[in-house]
Amino acid sequence: MGLYRAQFISMIIMIAIGTGIFVGFHMEWYSIEGNTSPFFEETGYADYRIISEKGYSADDLKKIEDIDGVDNAGRYVSVAADVKDRKDDSVALTVTTNEKVSGMLIMDGDKYDTKSTDGVWLSDKYADANDFKVGDSITLAYKGIEMKGVIKGLIKSGEQLICVRDSSQLMPDYNTFGFAYVSPVMYEKAIGRDYYPQINVVSSMSKKDFTEKADDALGNTALILTKDESASYSNAHGEVEEGQTMGSILPTLFLLIAILTMVTTMHRLTAKEKTQIGTLKALGFKNKRILRHYTSYAFMIGIIGSAIGMGLGFFVAWYIMNPNGMMGTYFDMPEWKLYVPSFCYYILAAIIVVLTLIGFLSVRKMLKGTAADALR
């Protein structure tokens, strides 16, 4: 079989590339889902955002909380505040009256304290990029109002999964922009009033039902945005859809080429091995044994190609999905685990079965007739 080594190697390479890209791309989008979903849930990512420039009072919040179907709600504000003594640096200064809604995940330092008068919980990525640590002083300025505080903790937040200044900034730049949470007490003391332009809500209700009930509760028609209209969630979902598309198109081309190459190669192999097959039959070898012998080549090509492809797929997924990889510059999340969709294993098994079947059918065709027929 040394005569066919080049063809076998080429088939193994094509199968490995096809399965590698297939597994890698599907692992990428599946891992995004697997890591962002619990992160969003743990930090209370808001399903709905009720917005009004006039702001919402504690009574308004109570009306929303009393709606049947609302799991949690909190008043919320997020504004771009400058970091004093740092040129061009700013953070998304964020306040939530309910840490279970649009909250944070503590990576280092103290737990979030809603009554703190000087505590600042700062993005850990921004802190790393700018040499801030727990216990350091920091001053945030917004429209002439300064808030002097002490960094109590380093955090991540689902609301800031993709931390950019605005829609004009495509990629996060933690050297100049991050986010920070302060307590409602510190915020209200600094601005001198109780002003929250948003009520963020966690609820599994449909938008239509929630909008109707929220409008009835507040007594007016409010601007309500879903999580699909928020940057972090929609962009993460977009990456998932892109990965699904890429994982369906490119690998298919490689796998089709590999299968066609297998059909051609096995046909040529059995044609050239016609005399040897006839000799084996003349020596008393049964058809089943000859079938097993030649079919095993196709089977081993499928096994080796798929195994190499699986390893390649993990490498592709890891290269994209790790804190220092492509997605690491885009997403800010605590977990970077790799997940394999279960259907990948079934498809790999199906590929091996198809390749083995091709080998089996090619050889069986040559076994028809007597040994004398094969030796002619």
Pin down the residues of each PLM region.
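Short cytosolic juxtamembrane segments of multi-pass membrane proteins
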Residues: 367-376
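Membrane transport/envelope proteins' first extracytoplasmic loop
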Residues: 1-259, 287, 327
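Small-residue-rich transmembrane alpha-helices
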Residues: 263-268, 275, 299-331, 341-368
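Short amphipathic alpha-helical coupling elements at transmembrane boundaries
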Residues: 2-3, 37-41, 275-282, 372-373
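Transmembrane helix boundary and interhelical loop/hinge segments in multi-pass membrane proteins
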Residues: 32, 43, 265-278
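Membrane-interface segments at the starts/ends of alpha-helical transmembrane spans
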Residues: 240, 244, 331-343
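Residue-level signature of the transmembrane alpha-helical core
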Residues: 12-16, 252-255, 295, 299, ...
